[in-house]
Amino acid sequence: MISLTTNACIVWKRLILMIACIGAIIFGTSVSHAAYIAPPSTIGEAVVLIDADTKEILFAKNPDKWMHPASTTKMVTLLTALELKGTQLDELATISSYATSMEESNLGVRVGDQITLEGVLEGMMVASGNDAAVVVAENVSGSVENFAKDMNRVAAKAGAKNSVFLNPHGLTQMGHHSTARDLAMIAAYGMKYQMFRDKVANDYYKVPYQNRTPETIRTTNHFIRNKYPGAN
């Protein structure tokens, strides 16, 4: 995931989860109910800290404010692919010229590349690849437009109530929005999948191209790069 002031980052812990949007830092922590703990100081415009098991809200700041979710959108893309494709992720993906035309950040796929859908998904999460997100959308649902509809259905199933996803990558688009509460609910829902947990935690990944030399990439998430506790 991209960790820039104009984008959003995600960091998960097993039991405690915090989601913040746009210019925020997201981190996992533990909470003791036996003693008073002062509310954390945060520069994020919107923040939610929840227990990922019980969905109890432990801390909130503007939890339902509409925000642009930026690259956290790819979390929904991953979850939607897992929900819809299940065990069919070993199929070779078709790479379109439209997918390769996306603005950065990108995984670097090319038309004609031979790579499984799972390989594209993994690369999408590690490199925050906008091109890979489009490849996922087109191969899962036939088009970006159809995939966006599927994203919204999956997000609602996960508990999101105030989100509209119009693309799989998170590039700015009018009407594409979410909230800190919704992203927290979506992330907590996704954590039930082992594959989801694995793919949001990778530091390095060797992209398994079958038609050219596999390429090793590193995550754009500086929390994972710097071994921040709970980031993986």
Language-model-derived ranges and their functions:
Residues 1-11:
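N-terminal secretory signal peptides that target proteins for export/translocation
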Residues 16-27:
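Bacterial N-terminal signal peptides
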Residues 30:
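Phosphodiester-processing cores and adjacent nucleic acid-binding clamps
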Residues 33-181, 185-194:
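Active-site-adjacent loops and short helices of periplasmic peptidoglycan-processing enzymes
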Residues 161, 172-232:
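Domain-terminus/edge residues, biased toward the C-terminal soluble/receptor-binding domains
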